[in-house]
Design a protein with these regions (language model features):
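Acidic/His- and Gly-rich active-site-bordering loop/insert found
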Residues: 3-104, 113-116, 120-130
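Hydrophobic beta-strand positions in extracellular immunoglobulin-like domains
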Residues: 66, 197-199, 264
Length: 398
């Protein structure tokens, strides 16, 4: 029996255990950097599997090691995030969230359960591969500045140094049984923009006595789009979107100030820095030119995510070996962001997608919605494929 077949066999053997882990995690979600019970559960399972670990990274993070033969030969890390979102779950399932207003609506329960499953499989096969596999259970992916940034600062990729890191993420647009890969640039950076436009409020019938912040804010929003369309290189994907505009006046009341919130996303760090400076300068100068003022606050989020080309090609080939060519898809650029991006700026990285969609079972909702759920057939694939990719990355040069 080949190693791939042995991994598939173990994934099938442990499938119900992996599902049970996922359902426990789903029923007991915790918000970013508050994953205390989740961390305790992961530690309990690692102890049960006989895998040594160190806890306490960024509060709740865990790093474990599985040493094969010749453990110093090569080190590959696998990452799973553990936090949930502040969403009220609307799924009617036995494992529905017990924590009101908190839900695993982004699939991090799947990621953690898959990594635990991969860990169990790899530990049982550690005499069959050379090198070391590092397991990174990470908190706080959903909250800036991102748990990955803290894990890196606290040495999660060191001692021994990881030459590569792999991560997977659920994708409800991809049918269960299939996975997706993309080599090179994949996901965008993400920065939050907060504008407070100040003027002088008053009666709507006497605009000459006021400095209208609603009008100023409207001009600012339109003008800022010119930064993307006329300053940005059209070959660099960029998005500037504003989703919150608060002007607490009335039909005949001009307010004193307007608050605007939005996001800027791109895939080039130099352009990112330049664009943010231009956004600040244009908002401030336009407000001043119209008689008001604009306070600009920019919260820097995650950098862009780039999949190492050769590593990603290797992983795609390995996925074809494991699942068949018909079940491995090529992904397009994705303007969402992920704090796995921090790892991609530290070492060779491959971030791929795990299909979870099954229309017959009603598993069709997108992530970050109250009805998001998966076809749990994906868990056996998620755990087994991650184990296989780790082994192939150890085995092959790229």
């Amino acid at each position: 029996m080949s190693l791939a077949e042995r991994i598939k066999s173990l994934a099938g053997e442990h499938e119900q255990h992996i599902i049970a882990n996922r359902q426990h995690l789903h029923a007991n979600p915790e918000l970013s950097f508050e994953e205390y019970q989740t961390s305790a559960y992961v530690q309990e399972k690692l102890t049960e599997y006989g895998i040594p670990f160190k806890a306490g990274y960024s509060g709740t993070g865990i790093v474990a090691h599985i040493e094969g033969k010749n453990p110093q030969k090569k080190v590959v890390a696998l990452r799973g995030d553990m936090d949930a979102l502040p969403i009220h779950e609307k799924n009617d399932v036995p494992y529905k969230s017990k924590n009101e207003g908190v839900m695993h609506a982004c699939g991090h329960d799947v990621h953690t359960a898959s990594l635990l499953g991969a860990a169990r499989i790899l530990n049982e096969l550690k005499d069959s591969f050379e090198g070391t596999i590092k397991l990174v259970f990470q908190p706080g992916e959903e909250k800036a500045p991102g748990g990955a940034s803290y894990m890196i600062k606290e040495g999660a990729l060191k001692n021994p140094d990881a030459g590569a890191i792999l991560g997977q993420h659920v994708m409800p647009l991809i049918p269960v049984g299939k996975v997706g890969f993309r080599s090179g640039m994949y996901m965008a950076s993400a920065d939050e923009i907060y504008l407070t436009v100040k003027g002088k409020g008053g009666h709507g019938a006497m605009p000459e006595l006021n400095i209208d912040p609603v009008l100023i804010a409207s001009h600012i929003i339109v003008a800022l789009q010119q930064i993307i369309s006329r300053n940005g290189d059209p070959k660099i994907p960029s998005v500037l979107s504003f989703g919150r505009f608060i002007a607490e006046g009335a039909t005949n009341v001009i307010p004193n100030e307007v608050k605007i919130e939005g996001t800027f996303r791109t895939m080039n760090e130099e352009w990112r820095a330049s664009a943010l400076k231009k956004i600040r300068k244009m908002a401030e100068s336009m407000a001043e030119g119209m008689g008001g003022s604009c306070e600009v606050e920019i919260i820097h989020g995650y950098p862009y995510l780039e999949n190492h080309p050769e590593l990603s090609d290797l992983c795609r080939e390995a996925a074809v070996e494991y699942l068949g060519e018909e079940n491995v898809l090529d992904l397009d650029l994705w303007m969402a962001s992920e704090d796995f991006s921090y790892y991609s700026h530290e070492t060779d990285a491959c971030f791929y997608r795990l299909g979870t969609r099954n229309e017959a079972k009603g598993a069709t909702s997108m992530v970050h919605t109250p009805t998001f759920n998966i076809d749990e057939e994906a868990l056996k694939i998620g755990a087994g494929l991650m184990a296989w990719l780790a082994v192939r990355t150890l085995e092959k040069d790229y």
